[in-house]
Amino acid sequence: MITLTGTPEHLGHLWGEINHVDIVTHVDEFLKLARNHHGLSEATLIERSRRYDEVVGELAPHWHLESEAIARAAGVERDLYHAFLAGKYRGLLFAGDCTSFAAVGSATADGRPLFHKNRDNRMRPQAFYRKATEVFGLDPIPYLAVGDTSDTGVMMMVNAEGLAGSADMAGPDADPYYDGLMNPYGLRHIAETARDCGEALEIVRMMNDRGLYAGADSATNWTFADKHGTAIVIYNSHRRLQVTSRACDGLVLACEREGLRERLETSLGDLTPADCNDASRLPGVLATENCSSLTVQIDPDQPETLTCAWAALGNADRAVYFPLYLGVETLPRAYLDGTLFAYSHRPDSAALIASVEADSELQRVHAEAEARTALTTNHALVARHHLETVAQYARAEAEKHL
């Protein structure tokens, strides 16, 4: 068991130590791509990443402390690792759309907001984790997130204020822009600072208006849902920002997928996390490039403790959805180091995957009930213990059966 609570230096050292093989491999692949396909030297990459460094220095300087510790622990040069972070996504330094949706209000079985994203991208090892960075004077909000093992960008998340979000490619941008912060880091900034959909929208607007956001030649769909029961989709190109969908009672879809709306509407009024997981495996939703998926159930009363997320690391029809609560301090190392992702590359049957998920869900429901009881009597540490058994049990079941 490990904890991602601590100073940026501590968190960076731990991340770099655990995932050093993937970091070295992916940085090397990035440098070879730059050199062999784009004719760019290491010095040019470093120079082109200066704007990224400046934006991070302004918005979230603790990220630099974390990434420098990652580079040291992994044994890669700091400036090259920063260039990797700046240019890894959408080829920012080299001048697939995902699927996100949310259900709020009477659309869900118990009124708790639901959020989901299927991430379709290169099939790299994935991590699922809770992070709480301790920075004097800043107090970043703790969050659960999914992303690559080789960097700390956030692909989909939910934070302790009860805000869930994602940032997906949204078709061509007629006015490409490369000199800024990619959306995985914009989403991390939102995870650490925003409390609801309104604040998330204002941060997206600020980054766009000030030229801090760089989406290369693709526009972005930002999808958010919060504990208040609001869900929005924001279309963001470099010349246009518009809320394209908003709901306080019903569904929002960042994009239409064959069979998706119909599947969700079939269970409208009774939607559960299991329905979101099922929808992620629909033929019209599940892409060959699907490398991870996240379903979130936001607890509106105690989001910092009882909000739960389930992640499938790897293609969703071959991966188990593993649960994790925001109220934990520790989590299995296998959630972080690519082990769960590796399970998805084994020839396990859909029936076995369903069985593991069902067993884990029975234990999770019991553990959450015990945690709620403990919280009513002000036994927060007892509640945390019950919630931490959820990921432990799911990991043990996977190790036993997969």
Regions found by a protein language model. Name each.
Residues M1-R72, G87, G105-M157, E161-L402:
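C-terminal, well-structured catalytic/ligand-binding subdomain of enzymes
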Residues L65-E68, R72, V76-T99:
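Conserved, charged/glycine-enriched, solvent-exposed linker/hinge segments
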